Amino acid sequence: MVYIIIVSHGHEDYIKKLLENLNADDEHYKIIVRDNKDSLLLKQICQHYAGLDYISGGVYGFGHNNNIAVAYVKEKYRPADDDYILFLNPDIIMKHDDLLTYIKYVESKRYAFSTLCLFRDEAKSLHDYSVRKFPVLSDFIVSFMLGINKTKIPKESIYSDTVVDWCAGSFMLVRFSDFVRVNGFDQGYFMYCEDIDLCLRLSLAGVRLHYVPAFHAIHYAHHDNRSFFSKAFRWHLKSTFRYLARKRILSNRNFDRISSVFHP
């Protein structure tokens, strides 16, 4: 079973289209929509699907919201060790049949952690560079000061399944037991670097991330204002410092040192 988790920060229109594309009542997976804004419209949209779970209450960041949804799944459904969680952004476009084929492929390969090829347009001419190398301090400095991201992996030259360092949280398929084993997302972050941190801990725990280029989805990525005076920039800077500081102390023996609903 695959538990698909979608977090909404006011993304009613995107989620309506996504649920239509995925056939939200399909028996092969269970969709959980976590509403960060207690939207009546979103609740009404979700009520059209008998097999969908809608949960709300409280305003949190990316990682915290996803942890809440995973904890809900853990308590209500008691997933098997080999079940999966798919963290899916609301602005992803993927057809039902394509997702099922991808899931079956990953299961056949026994990949514990994987992602696919994301594009930013329906013509599939613009890549979303969602798989990257783990950043170091100099990478963040160059990115902030010059707008150049040296950690991007050139996906155009990858034609077969490849192990990569990390992938964006917009599309992550991870074995349920492995996610819980590393205590999920670190809730000490807010909106930035949660995905890098999670991928690092999974890597340290021996869980390899496979990039599967043969499967595609569309991601209408929205990039926040990164000017030095913006709130998004301050969040990003704070998360960067946290990642760089904690990278030095993390190991596969001390994941309990993160802030998570799985380890209060």
From Swiss-Prot:
Pfam families found in the cross-reference section: Glycos_transf_2
- Intrachain S-S bonds: none
Q: In which pathway does it act?
A: Bacterial outer membrane biogenesis; lipopolysaccharide biosynthesis
Q: Which GO molecular function terms does the record list?
A: hexosyltransferase activity
> What GO terms describe the biological role, i.e. biological process, of this protein?
lipopolysaccharide biosynthetic process; polysaccharide biosynthetic process
- Keyword field: Glycosyltransferase, Lipopolysaccharide biosynthesis, Transferase
Q: So what EC number does this one have?
A: 2.4.1.-
Question: What the protein does?
Answer: Rhamnosyltransferase involved in lipopolysaccharide biosynthesis.
- UniProt record similarity statement: Belongs to the glycosyltransferase 2 family.
Q: What is this protein called?
A: Rhamnosyltransferase WbbL
Q: Which organism is this protein's natural source?
A: Escherichia coli (strain K12)
Please name the taxonomic classification of the source: Bacteria, Pseudomonadati, Pseudomonadota, Gammaproteobacteria, Enterobacterales
| Name of the gene this protein is made from | wbbL
